[in-house]
Amino acid sequence: MLAKRIIPCLDVRDGQVVKGIQFRHHEIIGDIVPLAQRYATEGADELVFYDITASSDGRVVDKSWITKVAEVIDIPFCVAGGIKTVEDAGQILSFGADKISINSPALTDPTLITRLADRYGVQCIVVGIDTWFDESTGRYQVYQFTGDEKRTKATQWQTLNWVKEAQHRGAGEIVLNMMNQDGVRNGYDLTQLKQVRDVCHVPLIASGGAGAPEHFLDAFKQANVDGALAASVFHKHIINICELKQYLSQQGVEIRTC
């Protein structure tokens, strides 16, 4: 059995790490490189960096900090933000990133997933999915351009259908960003995770809602996700990564200890 992964998420805007609630009202957390170093030292298995306004601004992720991060950490990291071409992805990988993640550009042009997978291999192609539960319809809907409040919009895709489509086109991993839960720390949406797990045959990463060690345990035990991504609980020192891993190990979760 592969070890489960604990993945701090660093949302990047204007060269700094920020954090919002339900993808809104972002506050500045700190500088990118020191935070990356901190999490690598504290026992993170992997890091994810999202340039949250790149797609809505019509630009690719700011590459200036990627090389610096690669120089100071020795764990894998993934970079996302406005990657629209095979060349964009190649540059980011050449600067030291281990994976690239695409979200809004894949919704605009789903063939991008296949072209990236064909060029670089499915193992380094992640598809991020921003999903919102609409109480009025009882459906999970995929949203696009979520880094910009003015441009955020619902797409034609229901979440389960897009998960299937992304895999069919070559996604090697799915990160499910559950927007309703983002930053509120009341737990991952286990109902949604279980539904997605049933149709997701590549590694699945839960994102949005972690507030306590038990929330990570629930995601691993009840929804059988491969990794759990979180931000505010790590940024604000609410949860210590090593202590979290010790707790999960004691509860029978296969995980790399610090």
UniProtKB/Swiss-Prot annotation:
Heterodimer of HisH and HisF. The active site is at 11, 130. InterPro entries: Aldolase_TIM (IPR013785), His_biosynth (IPR006062), HisF (IPR004651), IGPS_HisA/HisF (IPR050064), RibuloseP-bd_barrel (IPR011060). IGPS catalyzes the conversion of PRFAR and glutamine to IGP, AICAR and glutamate. The HisF subunit catalyzes the cyclization activity that produces IGP and AICAR from PRFAR using the ammonia provided by the HisH subunit. Pathway: Amino-acid biosynthesis; L-histidine biosynthesis; L-histidine from 5-phospho-alpha-D-ribose 1-diphosphate: step 5/9. One of its GO terms (biological process) is L-histidine biosynthetic process. The gene is hisF. One of its GO terms (molecular function) is lyase activity. It is an enzyme of class 4 (lyase). It is found in: Cytoplasm. Belongs to the HisA/HisF family. Gene3D superfamilies: Aldolase class I. It catalyses: 5-[(5-phospho-1-deoxy-D-ribulos-1-ylimino)methylamino]-1-(5-phospho-beta-D-ribosyl)imidazole-4-carboxamide + L-glutamine = D-erythro-1-(imidazol-4-yl)glycerol 3-phosphate + 5-amino-1-(5-phospho-beta-D-ribosyl)imidazole-4-carboxamide + L-glutamate + H(+). Transmembrane segments: none annotated. This is Imidazole glycerol phosphate synthase subunit HisF. Keywords: Amino-acid biosynthesis, Cytoplasm, Histidine biosynthesis, Lyase. It comes from Photorhabdus laumondii subsp. laumondii (strain DSM 15139 / CIP 105565 / TT01). It comes from the Bacteria. One of its GO terms (cellular component) is cytoplasm. Its main location: cytoplasm. Its EC number is 4.3.2.10.
